[in-house]
Design a protein with these regions (language model features):
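Short, amphipathic alpha-helical interaction segments positioned at domain boundaries
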Residues: 363-378
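Auxiliary N-terminal substrate/complex-recognition segments of SAM-dependent methyltransferases
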Residues: 6, 340-342, 370
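Minor-groove-contacting beta-hairpin "wing" of winged helix-turn-helix DNA-binding domains
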Residues: 357-361
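Short amphipathic alpha-helical interaction segments
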Residues: 332-346
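Local cysteine-cluster metal-coordination motifs and their immediate loop/turn environment
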Residues: 10-24
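A short, conserved structural fragment
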Residues: 346-356
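C-terminal scaffold of the Radical SAM
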Residues: 2-6, 25-49, 53-332
Length: 378
């Protein structure tokens, strides 16, 4: 294994579940100490498998990792560094909610080795935040970013497009205000209403409270133009970064670099096997206590699957993929309709070719799900 690997650690605890959340989380942290101990034991189980591999990214995701007390977080990171070989200059990312960020916590994260913080801002409009159960307000979000930027940390902010009550104007304002802070990375996600029964029911009952698909498309394109004018490059469907500030760990997923995952529901790609841990906390903890990984999925990836993944994941990146790889895969797949679809996407300006590489145009990114799903289903 030549490429440096990445390590993901899932910390599932939250004060409350947000209206749009589809991740594995728990609002009861009474078992947190036991869970952190299970993480350390799972790391031990993986130590021999990771022997000889080097890591250059550690991603503490959730859930709400910023809820973990600093002394426990420091111990966890020290345990991981003792089990896995991390390169100098490794990217250590922690996800945080704005309401958790204090000067004291920030300094503790830095002592733990955190160098990058991803903040769940989601919006800078109080009414929009309240509509989906966020616990912070706009002022609190800006205050948290200011505290983090003051320590020289690399900062990422998440925004959501399509929130209840959001207008094109309020979304534009959130993007512009985020650009004026010290962040060097911005992620914009479309609200997936179908993942929340309450939000989907509200959208059906009050469609006037939600931007239409066309309005979301226009707002997304405008946001990209705003970010570009402020020095951010659009490097992946949902992500913009200042030069050199791309999310190193997440890029591993899109380039099929080796990753290991610790914790409930964690996914990984290792030695061309896709694996995923069980999504139930009791099952996870009990399995690790018994000395075995709680795998709900463990299967090899065939050469054909790997080729398909390289295209599907690679097209998510603005650099795209070698045109020859796409053409070769289409020729080998034997789907009689796919070649015609492929030509249509190019003729319609969704895909562009330059320097022997095929990539989505900005408009193409908007319709990327349709295109990528076609590759998946062929």
């Amino acid at each position: 294994m030549t490429a440096a690997a990445g390590l993901y650690v899932h910390l599932p605890y939250c004060r409350s579940r947000c209206g749009y959340c589809a991740f594995v989380v728990s609002t009861d942290d009474s078992g947190r100490s036991e869970y952190l101990g299970a993480l350390a034991r799972e790391a031990t189980l993986l130590e021999s498998e990771a022997c000889g591999s080097r890591f250059d990214s550690l991603y503490l995701g959730g859930g709400t990792p910023s809820l973990v007390p600093p002394d426990e977080l420091v111990r966890l990171v020290e345990e991981l560094r003792g089990r896995f070989v991390f390169e100098d200059g490794s990217e250590v990312t922690l996800e945080a909610n704005p309401e958790d960020v204090t000067i004291e916590l920030r300094d503790a994260w830095i002592r733990a080795g955190v160098r990058r913080v991803s903040v769940g801002v989601q919006s800078l409009e109080d009414a929009e935040l309240s509509a989906v159960g966020r616990r912070h307000d706009a002022a609190g979000a800006l205050r948290s970013l200011d505290r983090l930027a003051g320590a020289g940390l690399s900062l990422s902010a998440d925004l959501i497009l399509g929130l209840p009550g959001q207008s094109a104007g309020t979304f534009r304002g959130s993007v512009e205000r985020i650009c004026a802070t010290g962040v060097d990375h911005v992620s914009i996600y479309l609200l997936e209403t179908e993942k929340s029964r309450a939000i989907e029911d509200d959208r059906r009952a009050h469609p006037d409270r939600y931007l239409s698909d066309d309005e979301q498309a226009d707002a997304w394109l405008e946001a990209g133009e705003t970010l570009a004018s402020r020095g951010f490059a659009h490097y992946e469907i949902s992500n913009w970064a200042r030069p050199g500030r791309e999310a190193r760990h997440n890029v591993k997923y899109w380039t099929r670099a080796p990753t290991l995952g610790l914790g409930v529901s964690a996914h990984e790609l290792w030695n061309e096997r896709r694996r995923a841990n069980a999504s139930g906390l009791p099952v996870y903890v009990a399995s690790v206590r018994e000395g075995r990984r709680p795998l709900a999925l463990d299967r090899p990836v065939s050469e054909g699957e790997a080729a398909r993944e390289r295209i599907i994941l690679g097209l998510r990146l603005s650099q795209g993929v070698p045109t020859a790889d796409v053409q070769s895969w289409i020729d080998e797949e034997g789907d009689p309709l796919l070649p015609g679809d492929y030509e249509d996407w190019r003729d319609e300006g969704l895909l562009a070719e330059k320097g022997g590489r095929l990539r989505f145009t900005e408009r193409g990114f908007l319709l990327s799900n349709e295109v990528l799903c076609r590759f998946v289903s062929s």
